[in-house]
């Protein structure tokens, strides 16, 4: 079994060795390279497919040979540098390949593609075969450049640097490619054979008959493919024809002669060097360290890449003339034909590739992006030679130059094994020394030495003379971190006076060592100038440098002209000539031939690395149009912004001398299309841009698929869960509403598609927009002034002919009301009489507002409100239309034509109503007559003839009566005729029975069509009532008469007939009441609603006023009393002055100033926050603010409240958490329980070592102080500034409150200190020690202790993010005023708010240039208090957003005086306030607090709550205060904390001071007239936002918001916008609910719902260096709750029970037993410094006994090896008294090449081009208990 396993293991290892061998890997990569098929296969396949016969066979062979030869040359070029440079020159393809392709295409296009002329039997003489060979060879060489090589082919270049035998790898990869190519060609041959043998294809007669035509067609297909390749290739080359040249004015600096000096070169070129063979094709190697020192800085940078004739050369390889002058180069006056051709055609300083221009807000040029850290070079790592791809290019170049001049024999003799052994021995020696030192320090602690003497201190430089004072931290080269600074060199005036300015410009200093190292330098100039100097003796101290010169001379003696001394002079060391030359070499300065005198210069030149920068400084299109660019920049932009149309919406009418285009206001209308320009530079080849894909119809931000993981909605799985839930419940509750919404959406989509089709139809017409615009203008004029007046005239003439009164006035009033507004193509209103810019090209729309419709008659205006309300509800039609080219009107641009209101429809409707009414009346009469006739015939006993006569008589009588009303004379004649034929008896009877009672209500005429619906109902009811009454009276009389004639009737019949009239009377009464109720109901309802509204609102006003007044009075009284009692106890004498001042200040309280800081902190607050909607938070916030402001307070009475673990009854949880976070209160730890945390062995191990938490006194001694500038020789100097209250550890409150008198404390404010420690401690603790489960909570308190309305879960039920996102989970920034901005992390997934528009529109008294140009030479202690804010607008009370408060650079709490603070002139009168809510008009001072304080009461800074402050800003001399204008994405306010480099004199002339610009902008932008104020008011309110809204979140809000914005733009351009505003509101075009959207959706709610995101302004808060010292000394931070203190050591401690993730610094932890001198174990973090700590870790990991452990992860190694590598731990087994297990220290160290990988990843993650961020990649050890 053992043998089998052994053989199996050998077999596996053998297979692994074979697989990892160079040959197999080369074959594999070569085979994969076969799939890199490009245009070179075009000629090869053509020869294989089309050629036939013997000549065809020869052509196939020649094509294959040329193809393989070309591929072999490409593989050789990978290793052979000259061939690679020859094929990889940037302009080779432009000069050679493109003309060859075009010539080949046009030459073969006019003749038969396969006709190569006459052929002979001799193949070598056949020109066609040679052409085939050359074509395949050349195309294979060009294949690498025509199309980008595939990823598989690029892998060859990567593996080249990982194998040792490179030539074997190249050969094997070529063989692999050849095998793959043969297989591919065999497959093609099999396919062709199958096609030829296929009967279905061969039997086609058409193909057989037209074989020659088919061949010609195939030839044409190949020609077309070749032409497409040429066209596609045209866009990928750096062509000088299509490349846009940047203007010379765009270059950085103020001179235009930058391009001429460096472009000159000679024909001499270094060949065959090792640098060429290694072939750095895409790197920009820095030059030698000994480059020219006084080269013009405005010229090209030293590290810039210079390509001439395709050879990448550094500046060292050029030949310059020796004598050049600053600002006056020799080649300044060259003409264009005197320059080299390539430098004339191609500008190497500009962007040919589609690179992104990274904005630089400083006055510097942009860093070149292609200067990456990927530079391959061999170096020694871990004692062995390895290839590093992050090697400094400048160092490699300098090393090669040194190696060419001198040999290093000592290093060459040693082998690699000996070097490695030496390296191991050195590391072991260092390891032993560190272990001994470490053990000595531990033993010293056990013997009882003072802890500060045991801890390792950082080495400092001191004064050599006195040895008493340290060198200042800034100038100490030993210190690291922020203490490292650049010393600003200054030349005394006496030295400057010695050197005249002319001589200073003419002289040029040349370094002599640089002259020695460069081979092409003329050394004869040296010999001519030796006699200028005096002969002095040679210094004996510098003899070792002389030997170096001798070695240089011997190594370079073979070269001509490089011999420094003659052979005779080389023998003696002390020869005079050698001494003379040595002095000349070190001290001499070459001068110009015109001036042979030696000039002295007292300028210190230090070695520094210059960052490679571009020669141009470009501006974006947005900056150019907004006027935010600097004065020194060009007049045109170079960076393309997002495509948009600028619409001028306001232009000043009165133009003064100072008025310019900048005063115009414009609206940017962005087209709804993807932004593929992406901040590209003009002239860059956009075709070369790859990695940008299109995966949906409209992409707002086009980006690479590499960033798809940062998108919230994935393209394939995008589900809006809340919206789906809403639709589900909506459909469950009611099916009809869901169907209705669905149908409306479908109709909208159909309308949009139809409008798109109409718009696309215009594109087929030549000049579509111009044609359509002219037609629209003609249609508008025709409609307004011809068509409509003609219709009005015809209508009124017709009314006159029909005997109706004309309506000239009404019609022409409506005609005048119709307005035609000219809009842009997208519908943005511009003006009524002015055409927009470029309207002839872009097109216009004409919007008809209040369109005129011809009506047959006009309704009466004197109508009741009820009827008008009903008519308005009935006639809800759009009040505007867009005019079409055919004269019709549409509601949308290019929409469908809706039906017009008809002129004859009301007339027909009125006739139909009258006909229906007449018909109904006739039917009623017939029905009544029928019923009465039937009843009468049943009851009466008379004959039918008598009854018919009586009925006819009554009917004739009724007709007579009606006729009498119409014409009395005709009735009189009829009456006489009738009376002549009747007897007197019947006449008397008829006269007696003809009386008919009229109604008691006067009936109006039914012909009046102006009666309302209510009047008609009343009239109908009155008619019916009067008719019924008449009938009942008539029936009663008839019954009474019949009863008298017949005698007494029966009882039953009499009672039945008696009840019927009673019932009729009751019905009459009910109808009468209903009539009155109908008439009075509407008025009653309106009066009732108004009365209730007034009563309730008055009560609300009185309650709010009384409560607010009582609240403020009680607060003032309580705190005045409290301050009075306290001051009487402490200092009775100063009470009167203080109280009087405070009372005066409280009277000057202004609530408007508090809203500024509140709204600013809203923008920086988190999303998941708790909301408070009760006003009691105001009083509690004020109470505890006052408590925290007092210097010393005894909180014994409040201690029980704060230490209560349950739900507090008298204190809100948020306020308690606030004071616990601020460090004011601390509660007990004994009731705190750990929830959902897994305790690892590191925490358990630290529980037994609590004794090593130093006390506050000792930690305060560790913190450096200002007076500790002397060297501590005998021990630590006692701190004399400590008082009793500071050393009393139990009373921590005194320590917190006496900061002003406590001089030892390093930071100026406890809050800032606590914040920094809180964030850094938490981050470091989580990164090293924490093991948090996915179900863990990060909040204030556990979920079980909080109720539903008290949870403040900042990461509650949220997926755990990366470790770097832990800073977002810290809720402490809700409670801080300053210093919290720099610690906020920006989420890259967000769409950020465009602050450019906000800041551009929000400022009224600002000069834009003042923000961009600041004074570098600011004075000391410059006060920028109130005067700094005069340039900003007064914010309105109802404003949506507010400005940012500029925080202090450094605060002085002692000098802060509570003065009335007029922040940004906020106490001025607000211009034209419009109250959108009535309840806010009664409380104008509470308007800012209306929506802010309810949501988050803690975000309002306590210092601005009920008092005002006057903040000061003290700017020191070394601090620069800059404001910069924002880019397209965001604004940066950067506070520079470092010294700038020396600027040029011309550059300083271009900068203006901040104070001068501030005075100018006050005078320039002052408001003078009322119209301007109205425009600013409108602009401030409704034109301050630009957001991206998701339609799924708030449906229909986007469209309504955009429509409102368009109306705002149109209103800004009007002189009197009030009337138009009212009319826009009436026609529902201006939505009032969006105007007051801030009352419905606060900024926090909008942020939560994802409508828009605000990017907070980053302020670089000054970072004090004391905190860095604390990080160095106390790295191991452990939370107090992680300790389990024994009972005998338990003392009173203060801890926050609600914050489980809070880490407290070590020096704040109270020591349980200070006099205890027993120490168990000390970790390296507590003793050694950071540098020594890292050194110890690395040396411990380098174990010479186990060589394999260097490149492996030691965590997976054997534990025995770990125990042996850490011997000092084995000796301390007895130290851990609580645990019996052994403590083992496991170190995790990555190999060196992994660190290089991290350094390369560094460039991607941090977007840096240098190694400044490499310090982030520090790997700390992990401690584990075995």
Curated annotation (Swiss-Prot):
- Pfam families reported in the protein's UniProt record: Ycf1
Which InterPro entries does UniProt cross-reference here? TIC214 (IPR008896)
**TM segments?**
18-38, 67-87, 127-147, 175-195, 221-241, 774-794, 1081-1101
The similarity annotation says:
Belongs to the TIC214 family.
GO CC entries: chloroplast inner membrane
Q: Where in the cell is it found?
A: Plastid, Chloroplast inner membrane
Tell me what this protein is called: Protein TIC 214
Instruction: Give residue spans, biased composition: Acidic residues.
Output: 252-266, 293-304
Share what the entry says about its subunit structure, partners included.
Answer: Part of the Tic complex.
Give the UniProt keywords, A-Z: Chloroplast, Membrane, Plastid, Plastid inner membrane, Protein transport, Transmembrane, Transmembrane helix, Transport
The UniProt entry lists membrane topology as: Multi-pass membrane protein
Q: What does this protein do?
A: Involved in protein precursor import into chloroplasts. May be part of an intermediate translocation complex acting as a protein-conducting channel at the inner envelope.
Could you name the domain of life of the organism this protein comes from?
Answer: Eukaryota
Segments of this protein annotated with the region Disordered: 250-308, 1032-1057
Signal peptide stretch: none
**GO annotation terms (biological process):** protein transport
Cite the record's Basic residues compositional bias ranges: 1042-1057
